[in-house]
Structure formats: structure tokens, C-alpha cells
Amino acid sequence: MPTIQQLIRKPRQPKIKRSKSQHMEGCPQKRGVCTRVYTTTPKKPNSAMRKVAKVRLTNGYEVISYIPGESHNLQEHSVVLIRGGRVKDLPGVRYHILRGVLDTQGVKDRRQRRSKYGAKRPK
């Protein structure tokens, strides 16, 4: 426990809150170009082939982002828009690709939560 004199000399420093998506630089979304599109397996209790892409952002950073929804049309050099939000069972994946924006197509035959997957309203 510091004395009052010590606190006068050197006051307490507030804790610095670090962003969980630092490469976004405070932006809600960022544009980037896919450098590699591949599948990877999740952590221990889960089992799947999760679709991810390595994306080079406009600010120069290279991040791994998750491709949500069933099937996608992404390949190398596709221009995508990413948002923050990690995938809990994929280490190092801290971003999501937005579907239905730029080169990414929306999910076909999606009926519920369509706005999350860039799907148009079914007729």
C-alpha cells in the first residue's frame, strides 16, 4: 500500500483497455484482398472443416478471417469487406467476412437471419 506522499509523487495509472480487433484501427469495417482461401479444423471438443481466408487489408495488415454460411465463391484476389468478431474454436481468427458485399456473394436459399448472410428476400 503506497503512502499518500508516494501517490502525490506518482499517481495511479488508469488501466489501458486494448481493442480485441486492433487491425481495424477503430473502423467498423475494412476492405481487403484475399491472399489465400482454405479450410482449417477447430479446437478440441469440436470437429469440422471451417472456411477461412487470409486477407490483406487496405492499411497493410494481413489477418485471418472467417467465411460464414454454407458455400462461398471466394478465391485468391477476391475483394472483401471484413468486420470484427472472433470465432471461439479457431485460434487466431478474429474477424468475419461480410457476405453479399463487394466480391462475396450472399448465401443461397437462406430464409432466416438473411441480413447476416447477404441474402435477398425470397419471393
From Swiss-Prot:
It comes from the Bacteria. The modification 3-methylthioaspartic acid is found at D89. GO terms for cellular component: small ribosomal subunit. Part of the 30S ribosomal subunit. Contacts proteins S8 and S17. May interact with IF1 in the 30S initiation complex. The keyword Heme does not apply. SUPFAM superfamilies: Nucleic acid-binding proteins (SSF50249). One of its GO terms (biological process) is translation. It comes from Jannaschia sp. (strain CCS1). Keywords: Methylation, Ribonucleoprotein, Ribosomal protein, RNA-binding, rRNA-binding, tRNA-binding. InterPro entries: NA-bd_OB-fold (IPR012340), Ribosomal_uS12 (IPR006032), Ribosomal_uS12_bac (IPR005679). Gene3D superfamilies: Nucleic acid-binding proteins. Residues 9-21, 110-123 have a biased composition (Basic residues). With S4 and S5 plays an important role in translational accuracy. Pfam families: Ribosom_S12_S23. This is Small ribosomal subunit protein uS12. GO terms for molecular function: rRNA binding; structural constituent of ribosome; tRNA binding. NCBIfam families: rpsL_bact (TIGR00981). The keyword Ribosomal protein applies. Residues 1-30, 104-123 are annotated as: Disordered. Belongs to the universal ribosomal protein uS12 family. HAMAP family: Ribosomal_uS12_B.
